[in-house]
Curated annotation (Swiss-Prot):
Species lineage: Eukaryota, Metazoa, Chordata, Craniata, Vertebrata
InterPro entries given in the database record: Snake_3FTx, Snake_toxin-like_sf, Snake_toxin_con_site, Toxin_cobra-type
Localization annotation: Secreted
PROSITE patterns (UniProt xref): SNAKE_TOXIN
Name of the protein this chain belongs to: Short neurotoxin 1
Disulfide bridges in this chain: C24-C43, C38-C60, C62-C73, C74-C79
Listed Gene3D superfamilies: CD59
Its job: Binds to muscle nicotinic acetylcholine receptor (nAChR) and inhibit acetylcholine from binding to the receptor, thereby impairing neuromuscular transmission.
Transmembrane segments: none
Organism: Tropidechis carinatus (Australian rough-scaled snake)
Family: Belongs to the three-finger toxin family. Short-chain subfamily. Type I alpha-neurotoxin sub-subfamily.
GO molecular function list: acetylcholine receptor inhibitor activity; ion channel regulator activity; toxin activity
Record's keyword terms, sorted: Acetylcholine receptor inhibiting toxin, Disulfide bond, Ion channel impairing toxin, Neurotoxin, Postsynaptic neurotoxin, Secreted, Signal, Toxin
């Protein structure tokens, strides 16, 4: 019985992947790709235009944005590249 209980606990931990940390891209505009581990369950990519051209900001979470800023939020590793 103890073996069965231990097996169920191990299977539950493996299935839930309790130690999983999401990875999001965090480079700005056309910089080389960089990533960061995130505590949040989503990544974002904000895009807007100013006098320098198109600006892209990437990171963890899904922030609120001002009008005129395009926001794309997603929930898989490096989905905001």
């Amino acid at each position: 019985m103890k073996t069965l209980l231990l097996t169920l606990v191990v299977v539950t931990i493996v299935c839930l992947d309790l130690g999983y940390t999401m990875t999001c891209c965090n480079q700005q505009s056309s910089q080389p790709k960089t990533t960061t581990p995130c505590a949040e369950s989503s990544c974002y990519k904000k895009t807007w235009k100013d006098n320098r051209g198109t600006i892209i900001e990437r990171g963890c979470g899904c922030p609120n944005v001002k009008p005129g800023i395009d926001l794309m939020c997603c929930k898989t590793d490096e989905c905001n590249n």
